[in-house]
Regions:
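Glycine-rich, proline-tolerant flexible connector loops at the mouths of alpha/beta enzymes
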Residues: 17-55
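Active-site beta->alpha loop and helix N-cap motifs at the rims of alpha/beta catalytic domains
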Residues: 40-105, 113, 127
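Conserved, mostly hydrophobic/aromatic
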Residues: 11, 87, 121
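Active-site glycine- and acidic-residue-rich loops that bind
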Residues: 1-4, 119-130
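Glycine-rich anion/phosphate-binding loops
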Residues: 1-10, 56-58
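Conserved beta-strand positions in the central sheet of alpha/beta enzyme cores
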Residues: 18-20, 76, 96, 119
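Catalytic domains of carbohydrate-active enzymes, especially glycoside hydrolases
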Residues: 6-24, 91
Length: 131
């Protein structure tokens, strides 16, 4: 968190209008099996990697407040219903769905209930796979 002000200040100076974050809650998006998967490039399992890269709710809220204080919009990609609920509680103006989740219809339908704009990434998916 210590580098956040410097990065956000630089973003503002560069003309950034919207900061897009990723909201991960490892316990809500990964099974216990993820604790057994260890990529070859690390000693940590996938669960630990995601958990270590995730901001706590308090830290993410502070990030959002700092972004807004600087006059930029804060949006995020939630990877679970719990993450979507967190963002909804903060009344963010829009949600981003990552290309890996563009077929996660239960999550997308859940987020649609918030009546906010959704930016849907499709990545390398083809039209058939996203219909």
């Amino acid at each position: 968190m210590s580098c956040i002000p410097e990065i956000m200040d630089a973003a503002k100076r560069a003309g950034v209008k919207i900061v897009k974050h990723q909201t991960h809650i490892a316990s809500e998006e990964m099974s216990g099996y993820a604790k057994k998967i260890i990529p070859v490039h690390t000693k940590d399992n996938i669960y630990e990697i995601i958990d270590n890269c995730s901001l706590s709710e308090s830290d993410e809220y502070q990030l959002m407040l700092y972004v807004k204080e600087k006059g930029m919009e804060f949006i995020s990609t939630p990877f679970s219903r719990a993450a979507a609920d967190r963002l909804q509680k903060w009344d963010i103006p829009a949600y981003k769905i990552g290309s890996g989740e563009c077929n996660n219809y239960p999550l997308i339908e859940y987020i649609c209930k918030f009546n906010k704009p959704i930016i849907l990434s499709t990545g390398m998916n083809n039209i058939k796979s996203i219909k």
